[in-house]
Amino acid sequence: MEAAAGGRGCFQPHPGLQKTLEQFHLSSMSSLGGPAAFSARWAQEAYKKESAKEAGAAAVPAPVPAATEPPPVLHLPAIQPPPPVLPGPFFMPSDRSTERCETVLEGETISCFVVGGEKRLCLPQILNSVLRDFSLQQINAVCDELHIYCSRCTADQLEILKVMGILPFSAPSCGLITKTDAERLCNALLYGGAYPPPCKKELAASLALGLELSERSVRVYHECFGKCKGLLVPELYSSPSAACIQCLDCRLMYPPHKFVVHSHKALENRTCHWGFDSANWRAYILLSQDYTGKEEQARLGRCLDDVKEKFDYGNKYKRRVPRVSSEPPASIRPKTDDTSSQSPAPSEKDKPSSWLRTLAGSSNKSLGCVHPRQRLSAFRPWSPAVSASEKELSPHLPALIRDSFYSYKSFETAVAPNVALAPPAQQKVVSSPPCAAAVSRAPEPLATCTQPRKRKLTVDTPGAPETLAPVAAPEEDKDSEAEVEVESREEFTSSLSSLSSPSFTSSSSAKDLGSPGARALPSAVPDAAAPADAPSGLEAELEHLRQALEGGLDTKEAKEKFLHEVVKMRVKQEEKLSAALQAKRSLHQELEFLRVAKKEKLREATEAKRNLRKEIERLRAENEKKMKEANESRLRLKRELEQARQARVCDKGCEAGRLRAKYSAQIEDLQVKLQHAEADREQLRADLLREREAREHLEKVVKELQEQLWPRARPEAAGSEGAAELEP
């Protein structure tokens, strides 16, 4: 215990691990996942404190034992040397791709860059087109809720966006958002996860129950962004954007590419999503697990495959080919010739056809390619059992490649389109129309099953049982309808695909003539005529095989075994030829891709050069206009300055005369005013004289009046004085 405690006390985290954690902590601050939400430093400190306490408790001395016992020896733990410092983790340089491409988001074309396999969309273009009806506050709130973080583009990417006219030349920076986060953001803002307004429970329950119980609906689900279950109605899928899936939570109808983003449960906001594209909904929508082990699982699976194949113009979706054993069962042994007229048992009908179907369906394993439909969904957990089973089956299954690798025939050689393959135990003759007449002899089904669907060698089979005649007629009708559908689909696909493999018709026709079926059919029917366009070597080989089968091999089992060996040899030759053709097609496709990429880059460079030339012309015109205006203003100011200088010189010469004239005018005015004042003074003097004369005359008159009145006044005054004296 003490040793363990001591060893625990001296433990230190691995230097390489500690360095990795520190680098992750520093780099996560600027990563796309936002700021680091967890730091390992507090955990290390807590662990150090706990280990220090345990080491202190272990260092306490033990009690002294009895004298009979020897003193205990304290065994200290050996000091372990520090582990060697390992080199740090290998960090790949960040992908700074500057190759601009375009993608479609909610019907709008958005420019983007492919960085690390994920498309980074131009955020300003999304805000101005798809989310133009929402404010920045709403968008930021949804981004915080969904934990969506955007990155900034590099200087080269910003320059490309400016040159292409997507951003103005004055833009200082630009944000980039991944295609997955853009799908989540647009779905949350445009459609939201709100439930519809409540309605009557009885009506809603009856409608939902009626749709669920209907045989025309299929229960499906997806595991993207929190999972969602729904009901698929194949009849409603009439266009690529038709609403044909009903959500079991909100009872609303959605198109397939909208249903894979729709969810009402946990939105997986703290999950790092990568590589999601709603256009790949065919890989995300899966059949409900409620059908596991039920009878209708195969039928509903075929129905779902039919829906996924509709409107698949890019021919990206392929049916799942069932994985069965490549070796024929040990119990498959044809009956003797005397019982050939009797109708074989149902088990004997199924076993040869299943083995031949296995031989035909093994083309998927020829070049190590994995069918897109066989790959697990990007949002489902990976199971190692699947890869183990694939590895076990792959070395035993022979390869049988037909026509072009990029066509549907490479995955469905012996199966008509729109006809799903059932499990091996439940296979019937009807599921494979070309194998309908394959129950009488072993060579005949091999010839009909492995024969390509475009060119068929129509021969008479005299040894065929009469009991199969009513079954073969409707099967031939179905086969003809399937041929028409195959040819129309192939023409439409070839018209849409610009990177189709070269010389498709020639290679397919050449392989049709060299297929095992074409070789085995004359061996079963000796009276049949060889095709007119077959080469002489093929006829000789067929004749040699016919003689070997008829002469050297007596029993049917020996013939079947020999034919099986021949088919295996032929399959190996076909595999080598197919590998060579595939390599040639790959080289052609790569060359075409390089040519298209070079043409696109040249076009972009030419367009950028044209835009730069236009920008230079515009700047030159603006500069010329500004220079012209500057010259005109300079000349105008020069003229004004010259006029001012001349006016100043003229003022200096005429200043004295101007002052003299001014003063003379003032003197004249003053003289005039003085003359007026003199005239006024003379007039006033005359007026004063007249007034004096008038006053003197008046005084004279007054005196005369006084003299006339004066004598009367004296007696009256004397009388008044005497009366006054008498009164006292």
From Swiss-Prot:
Residues 493-509, 518-539 have a biased composition (Low complexity). This is Ski oncogene. The keyword Repeat applies. GO terms for biological process: anterior/posterior axis specification; bone morphogenesis; camera-type eye development; camera-type eye morphogenesis; cardiac muscle cell proliferation; cell motility; embryonic limb morphogenesis; face morphogenesis. Residues 536-710 form a coiled coil. It is linked to Shprintzen-Goldberg craniosynostosis syndrome: A very rare syndrome characterized by a marfanoid habitus, craniosynostosis, characteristic dysmorphic facial features, skeletal and cardiovascular abnormalities, intellectual disability, developmental delay and learning disabilities. Keywords: Coiled coil, Craniosynostosis, Disease variant, Nucleus, Phosphoprotein, Proto-oncogene, Repeat, Ubl conjugation. The modification Phosphoserine is found at S383, S432, S480, S720. Ubiquitinated by ARK2C, promoting proteasomal degradation, leading to enhance the BMP-Smad signaling. Residues 474-485 have a biased composition (Acidic residues). Pfam families: c-SKI_SMAD_bind, Ski_Sno_DHD. Belongs to the SKI family. InterPro entries: c-SKI_SMAD4-bd_dom, DHD_Ski, DNA-bd_dom_put_sf, SAND-like_dom_sf, SKI/SNO/DAC, Ski_DNA-bd_sf, Tscrpt_reg_SKI_SnoN. May play a role in terminal differentiation of skeletal muscle cells but not in the determination of cells to the myogenic lineage. Functions as a repressor of TGF-beta signaling. Residues 321-357, 452-542 are annotated as: Disordered. One of its GO terms (cellular component) is nucleus. SUPFAM superfamilies: Putative DNA-binding domain, SAND domain-like. The gene is SKI. Interacts with SMAD2, SMAD3 and SMAD4. Interacts with HIPK2. Part of a complex with HIPK2 and SMAD1/2/3. Interacts with PRDM16 and SMAD3; the interaction with PRDM16 promotes the recruitment SMAD3-HDAC1 complex on the promoter of TGF-beta target genes. GO terms for molecular function: DNA-binding transcription factor activity, RNA polymerase II-specific; DNA-binding transcription factor binding; DNA-binding transcription repressor activity, RNA polymerase II-specific; histone deacetylase inhibitor activity; identical protein binding; protein domain specific binding; protein kinase binding; RNA polymerase II cis-regulatory region sequence-specific DNA binding.
